[in-house]
Amino acid sequence: VLQNPEASTDASIRLAGQLNQQRELNPTQPAVRELCESVLLEGCERWIRHVIDQQPPQGRGPWVPGRYQLRLIDIWLNCQMEGDYNPMHTHGGSFSGVVFLKVPSQINGSSFDGQLCFHGPEEYHLQSFRTGMAKYVLPSPGDFYIFPAWQPHSVMPFRGSGERWSLAFNVVAQPTSGHPRPPEQNQNISLSSQRPGAKGL
C-alpha cells in the first residue's frame, strides 16, 4: 500500500481527518485478514473481558462468551504530515482502535504535537474546570489502543518534517445466531396498537 498508494481506495472522503493520505485496506487480503483475526479482534475481545469480567454475572448483559461475535467493519491507513490534524469525532460500530506504525522523532511528549486525545464529557460544559477533561496519548510505534466507538477523540497537528503513520479500524459486536434473545417477561402492551389509527380528512 505504501509503495503504490493510488492502488488502494482513498478513504478521506468518508473520514474526518485532514491528513495527507488515508487509504482503505482490503480485509480479504491474507495479511490483513491474519492481522485482523490474530491481533485486532483478539485485542477487542481482551478489552471486553477486562471490562465485563469485573461485573457480577447478572450485570454482564449480552457480553457472555459465545453470545456475540466480533466483525471488522473497515480498516485503513493514515499518513499525517506537518500541519495535518484530525478534528474531534466519533466512529460507527461498537469498538474502534488504532495501531501506531511510524512516528517522527519530534513527537516526543515535550508538547501535545501529534498526540491522540480522548475527550471527556466535561468538554461540552464550557464553565466547568478542565481537570480530567482530556487524556493525551503519546504515539509510539507498535502501541495499540482500543476504545468504544462512541468515545470522542482527535489527533493534534505536529511541526517539522517526517510522517506519522497509523492503522485505524472499526469493529461491530453482533449476537450469534445460536443464541437468540430470551423472551422478555411482563411485556407492556401499547394502547396505541389496540385502537384504530387516525383517519385522514
Enumerate the language-model features and the residues they cover:
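Non-heme Fe(II)/2-oxoglutarate
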Residues: 1-65, 83-85, 188
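Compositionally biased, intrinsically disordered low-complexity segments enriched in polar/Pro/Gly
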Residues: 4-8, 12, 126-130, 200
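Aromatic-acidic/polar surface patches that form glycan- and anion
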Residues: 29, 33, 90, 160
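Catalytic core of non-heme Fe(II) oxygenases with the double-stranded beta-helix
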Residues: 66, 70-146, 156, 163, ...
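Karyopherin-beta/Importin-beta family HEAT-repeat alpha-solenoid scaffold
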Residues: 154-156, 189
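Acidic, two-metal ion nucleic-acid-processing modules in DNA metabolism proteins
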Residues: 166
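Double-stranded beta-helix
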Residues: 170-201
